Amino acid sequence: RVDCLFDDNYLKASKNKLLAKYPILKDKKIILYAPTFRGNIYQGFSMLPFDGEKLINSFDENTYLIYKLHPLLKNICLPQHPRIIDMFNEDTHELFALSDLLISDFSSIVFDYSILNKTMYFYVPDLNDYLKDVGCYVNIDLFPGKICKNIDELIQGIQKNEVGNLEAFKNIFFEYQDGKNTKRVVELIYDILKKSL
């Protein structure tokens, strides 16, 4: 699913496509907020409280906040602000190309985003509860960005440009970084089928 993120032509075309659709974002700093859901099928799904207005008001008029919520959160109301844009229906990988930095939490998209070597922040005010109740695939000490337990820590981290070790994170989770993973899988399946006949 990530081969396209190694393709500079795809990234450029994706960014240009979205800028044509949202010309107000041209030459702006774009913060992508893409959290995973909380809850479950029995209790319902929800999103962590996130003060997007406070965040965006902490930056100048050249900064925009775009939301890309998890598909299970499609009915969440977002703050009404001229520099906050709901991009629920846009392709996630195309938004990666458009954005300058990512705010997420325990979403698996952080793995994909790391390919682009762009800054990430982890907004997890429920960190201890989440780890206790749900758990995490990865030791959070390996996360390639500042872990923020409240909106003020997040704003401060972005303002100070506090960054993590993206290269190390990417190298742990992507053995191959050449955009040919799909080709390898197809060849492997072909070889297995060929041997079984």
Question: Predicted regions span which residues?
Answer:
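A nucleotide-sugar donor-handling region in carbohydrate enzymes
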Residues: 1-42, 166-168, 196
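Short, solvent-exposed loop/turn segments at secondary-structure junctions
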Residues: 2-5, 36-40, 71-74, 92, ...
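Structural motif
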Residues: 30, 64, 100-101
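Catalytic donor nucleotide-activated moiety binding site of glycosyltransferases and closely related
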Residues: 33-38, 56-87
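Charged helix-capping and loop-helix junction motifs
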Residues: 45-52
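Donor nucleotide-activated moiety binding/catalytic core segment of transferases
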Residues: 71-111, 116
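Catalytic binding pocket for nucleotide-activated donors in carbohydrate/polymer assembly enzymes
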Residues: 108-174
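C-terminal alpha-helical cap of glycosyltransferases
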Residues: 178-197
